[in-house]
Amino acid sequence: MSAQTLAISNLKPNTTRHLASFHPNIWGDRFLSCAAESTDIEDDMEQQVERLKEEVKKMIASADEPSQILNLIDLLQRLGVSYHFEKEIEEALQQVLNMNSDSDKDDDLHSVALRFRLLREQGLNVSCDVFNKFRDRNGHFIQTLKTDLQGMLSLYEAAHFRVHGEGILDDALAFTTTYLESIVPNLSPPLAAQISRTLRQPLRKSLARVEARHFISIYQEDTSHNEVLLTFAKLDFNLLQKLHQKELKYISLWWKDLDFVNKLPFTRDRVVEGYFWILGVYFEPQYHRARKFVTKVINVVSVIDDIYDAYGTLEELVVFTDAINRWDIDCIDQLPEYMKVCYKALLNVYEEIERALSEQGRSYRLHYAKEAMKKLVQAYLVEANWMNKNYVPTMDEYMSIALVSCAYPLLTVTSFVGMGDIATKEVFDWASNDPKIVRVASIICRLMDDIVSHEFEQKRGHIASSVECYMKQNGVSEEATRDEFNKQIVDAWKDINEEHLQPNYVPMPFRTRVVNSARIMDYLYKDDDEYTHVGELMKGSVAALLIDPA
């Protein structure tokens, strides 16, 4: 797009800036006027949830056959209530692991695949050799398996937990995908829609709350549904939704008070989308303070990103980067007026959480979060230099910076800050030293983002993305580049699965945050950048999670 000039005080006159023209916030003040529920009603809902929760615990305890245990756990996960029973599920899956699973009734494709998936998801490294029994002498999957739709769907879901060198799971994914795609046109509309959704978003890459909201509506139409589980899931979803609505109202008021929409009109106004993003990282009630902090950080980072990408001159960005590195309010006088607004907001967000952490004796965590922010803006400045020189780096050079500028290392460290006693200094040391699982999640983030957004960014004037870098370095077409990147994304997911199975690793809650970050990218960037260009997928997802009750 054409360069535009925007006059702001303290700037050199007639400074030419390449503006991105992001579309405005589509939600208006909707979430500012979230109606407060009667505390009596919420108290009653909480009491019902606690009563039903005890009934579900009895169900888990009374399940003794492996298939019964596995199907119940699968159901609890899909309904979005498994977070209530983490200890019980861990013990039950350990029990299943120790059981003899060779009985005929647990030997069908569905049971074997479900057992494999749930155990791998729990971080237990079970062998993929369990699927050998479903192959013929030539190593191909037996064609009669296609008569078992439930088994084929379960095998498809299990195959997404593959790691490098597991050719049988590569074959399983190809086998099930080809078959499921072939039958969709001949199925009834509801079943066709359900399988199409599964093909687009397998459980390994789905967002927990989005999946729960969808599955609750499917499960209630099942005539064999368990009334206790359905009632529990709906009550729990609606109670959590009320909490999330209150959080978003609080965040929206904070955002409105900052008035970035008027003070920094060249930036993206995506406070609702930012909150949805963080809901994908963690939705559980115990992380309510963490969600508020990280949502504020992510929204300020979005503004900072736009300052580096779409507005600031190189001279201004050098000063801005130095100010963030110094992290001192006295630096504010060196900044142009528009940067002062953002800089003050950034320091205030961290100061607010630092006060809360100091009361708990955890203020050391902010050091890690601040260092991650400093690394991020340093990467932004390198990219701004490239842009200023019209420089196209090599892929290795580009990725060394882009895996930081994608902000996933920052998101990882920052998401741990409010996670309670389990977030030890050792966890922060680990997260701050480029662990492989964070690095490969960042690869997924960067490549998926670049694939869908590079055309828009090149039109407005932007650094060369990985797409342009790879095409230039290898002399190949855009289509060939996309194919190569998609292969790298597949490999990155295998790396994530592999890291998830490592013994003596960081605790599961931290691994889950990283996996969830990769899931968000797969969900929102599969066809377009749904954060920058809010489309039907984002609109529908926000409505399902934050507006419409179950």
From Swiss-Prot:
Sequence positions that bind Mg(2+) 2: D305, D309
GO MF annotations, alphabetized: magnesium ion binding; terpene synthase activity
Domain of life according to the entry: Eukaryota
EC number: 4.2.3.-
UniProt GO BP: diterpenoid biosynthetic process; hydrocarbon biosynthetic process
Residues annotated to bind Mg(2+) 1: D305, D309
Cofactor detail note: Binds 3 Mg(2+) ions per subunit.
Chain location of the short sequence motif DDXXD motif per the record: 305-309
Keywords (A to Z) from UniProt: Lyase, Magnesium, Metal-binding
Necessary cofactors: Mg(2+)
Top-tier EC class: lyase
Binding-site residues for Mg(2+) 3, renumbered to this chain: E457
Pfam families: Terpene_synth (PF01397), Terpene_synth_C (PF03936)
Additional remarks: Does not produce any detectable product when tested in vitro.
Annotated domain remarks: The Asp-Asp-Xaa-Xaa-Asp/Glu (DDXXD/E) motif is important for the catalytic activity, presumably through binding to Mg(2+).
Function statement: Probable sesquiterpene synthase.
Protein family (similarity comment): Belongs to the terpene synthase family.
Official protein name in the record: Probable terpene synthase 2
Source organism (scientific name): Ricinus communis
Gene: TPS2
